[in-house]
Every structure is written in structure tokens, then in C-alpha cells.
Amino acid sequence: KFTQQKFTVDKTAPVIDVSFDNNSAKNGNYYKADRTATIKITEHNFNSGSQYVNIPVTAEGTTAPSVVGWSGSGDDHNATVSFNKDGKYSFTVDYTDLAGNKAVQKKVDSFYIDKTAPEVEITGVADHQAYNGTVAPVVTYRDDNFADDHDFRFTKIDINGKSDDTSKFDYDTGGNGVTEFIYKYRDFAEVLENDGIYNFTVELSDKAGNSTSKSVTFSVNRFGSTFRTTDEPTEKLINNGYTNAEQDIVVEEINVTPLTKHSVTLAKSGGNSTELVENTDYTFTSSNNGNEWCKSVYTVNKKNFSDEAAYTVTIMSVDKAKNTNNNRMADSSLSTEQKNKRECAISFVVDKTSPLVSITGIKDNELYKEASKKVKIVCEDDNLDKSKLVVTLDNKKLAEGEDYTIVDDKDGSIAGMLTAEIVLKAETGGIKENLKVTIGDLAGNTGEKSVDNFILSANIFQRFFANPVLVICTFAGLALVIAAVIFFVAKKRKKAE
């Protein structure tokens, strides 16, 4: 007699499937966030016992995670594995059901979890520091999953604005090339155009896509200050070198870095140099926020120039990079053209005295019994501008070389003196004439002299009629004579009758 028994016939092989919640890989198999694997086994007669399920997880650099318990509905049965620590992982899934049917093995190839951003260090230059010597930044990059994925950028700030100067600077590489890489920049060339404020930005990414950014702002200041004037009256005075009225002197000093010291010295002809007192003799203002060039403005009070004299203003400063700056002397290594652009020499003369003009040979209201007359003109001034000589005869401008000549002494033209000679001719028929001489000096003062109402004539009749008093007296006398003659003639006739 047989006992009734139940049994199951199962000829269907189980099916294994593995899925992940994070499939955003970089460089094939690098992930910068956690991954959770869901293992699904489709089997009607499922058993989670270890003799049926085998899921070995391999981990490098960390501890292998465990499979978290099974749950399911119907024939589908699920378990999860969480990969939440940095490391390299791989695993396989094998399952054999109760009937001995084996599922096709599911193999998950190795992948990396890397949630750690690269370590970046910038040396060789420091934030908000100024350099007048070697400038050679060094970037050190450390990461377990190194990738040569970097962006280095030098943004230069100069007086005219910003520019991308990245391509101007070269580097050499070092490090082990696996977990550490070093970029060593070569010393910036010591040329004027490299002076400026630099924002050096470094951005590096590893194989998982983690990125780190770092930046430093530093200054290259090997050539010191540029001095200039944007004040129109000051610029005009510097270019001319002379003035007849004292005025404020305004000068700008432009430097890559802030100034730590400054002074203004005034030299005056006939006296010693004097260091001026800030806020009494001059004012000083400076603006700098660390991310732009420093602009300092010196305003020297006009009261310092009240006397007639020759003046020289010297501005000296020391900047944060320890350069000593002088408005009259730029760095000696610069070209002449570069020096001229960076210097602003301030030397000028205050002259309030008008030129002295004298005319000899003729006088006001004089009558000359000559057909021609030689006249001498002498102009005197310490700062005479001989090009401003104007000679007019009866409001007609005379021409040098044609109407008058400039006379030099045997040693050449005397400094501060001009002598001219003019030969006046009696061509106006005894009419009164006026000679006027005007001349200016380099400071803008004007001197003048005139001789008015003179007469030049060799003709006795022209001279007679040119003298109204003589003409009136003559005709008055003649009238009296005629009247007397008429009177006597009339009287004689009356007696005869």
C-alpha cells in the first residue's frame, strides 16, 4: 500500500536581473554618488537560503557591503546592495532553485564610487600678495582617481581693463602621475607688460567628475608706478613750462599695488628743496580695493608757487612690492619710450612780469625834416618769446626781413633781449603816423610801446601843411596883412576924393 505524497515538477530555470538607481557614469565606470543595486530573481519556488543564493561582492579600498533581505510578490523576489563608500566594486549573482535548475549567472563588472573632490594646493604665490622678483605659481593636484582634466586661467587686470593672459605662461609637470600631479609654472618674464594684478583660477576634475576650484589674486609689480596728469591746466603748464599765474598742480600715480609711503618735495630757484606738508601744502587721496590697480592723486596747492621763480616738484613713494618710485625717474631697465610714458617731470617757471619795450629814434608828436629815419626797437624779458614780436605802422603789420630786421650782437642774440631796426621813409605826404610794438613772453605776459603822431617829411611845404598851428598862424597873419592893405588903400582913396 502506497502513501500519497505531494511533489512538484519544476523544469523552469530562474531568471536573474540586476538594476541600479544611479547610472550616471563618468569615464565609463566612475560614479560621484552612491549606487544601490536591486537584485531581482524571478522564480516560482524561491528560497533565499545560502545554499541557493550566492552573491559575492568584491571591494577594494573599503569593506564590501552586505545584501539586504529579500522581499517579493508572486514569482519576483528582490534584495538590495548599497554602495555608499568610496571604493572599487564588483559582484556576481548565482541562484539554483529547489529543483536544481540554475539561473544564468549575472555578473556586474567593476565600477568605482568616488565622492571625494580632488585636493588642490596653490603655492609659489599667495592671495593678495605683491611680487617684484620671482613669480612662479605651482599647482599640486591629489586624487585617487586622477584625471588630467583641468582648467587654469590667468585673468590680468591692468589700468586699461581685463584680459585673458593664460596662454602667455608655460608650465612643466611633475608628481607620480597616479595620485599626484604637479604643474610648475616658469618664472614670469621680467617685462613691463607682465606687471599687473592677476586672478589665477584653478579648476580640476577627477575621473568621477568631482571638481575643485581654487583661486588666488596676486600682483606682479617689478617696474613700480606710472605718473601722469589728467588735469588739463596742469598738463598745459607742464607742456609749456611757463605761467604768469600760480595754479594747483594735480598728478596721478598709478601702481599695481597700494602705496606704503609717499612724499612731495618742492625745489625753488634761489632756495633749497623743501618737503611739503600733507593736508597743508598738498592733499593726497588713494583708492584700492585689492582687485584693481591703486590710483593715488596728489594736489599741490597753488600757494606754494606765489613767487616768481623756477619750480620743480618731485613725488616719491614706496609701494607694497617695495619698489621706490619717482615721478622724474622710471626704472632704468625700461626703454626710452616706456620711461616717457611712466614719468611725469614737473618743472616750470612762474613769471608775472611783462616784457619791457623801448623805441628810440622817434618821439610822440615830433616833426622830422628828413626823408627817412632809422628807428631802434629793444625788447627785454628773462623769458622773452621772440616769435611773438609784432610791429605795426598805422595799424598795418610789418614783415620781418622786408620792413624791419632783427639785429644780433657779435656773439649772437642776447638772452632775454631782442633788438630790431626799422627805417621809416617819408612816403605819406606829411601825414601823422603811429608806430606800435607788441611782444609776449613764454609765460603769456604782454609788453607794448607806441610812438604816436610823428611826422616824417623832407618837403618844406609838406612839413608846413603838416603843422596846423603854423598853418593857422600863417593864414591869420596873412589875413591881417591883407586887411591892413585894404584899409590903407581905402583910406587913401577917400582922401583923394
Where on the chain are the PLM-derived regions?
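Aromatic sugar-binding surface patches on proteins
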Residues: 71-79, 174-187, 287-299, 409-423
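Extracellular acidic loop/turn motifs
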Residues: 41-52, 62, 141-152, 253-261, ...
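Membrane-proximal extracellular "stem/stalk" segments
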Residues: 341-354, 378-380, 393-395, 402-463
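Short, solvent-exposed loop/edge segments of extracellular or virion-exposed proteins
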Residues: 15-28, 121-131, 228-240, 355-367, ...
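Flexible, low-complexity linkers/stalks enriched in Thr/Pro that connect modular domains
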Residues: 3-14, 108-121, 206, 216-230, ...
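Surface-exposed, short loops/turns at beta-strand junctions within beta-sandwich domains
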Residues: 81-88, 188-197, 300-310, 422-432
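C-terminal membrane-anchoring or membrane-association module
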Residues: 479-497
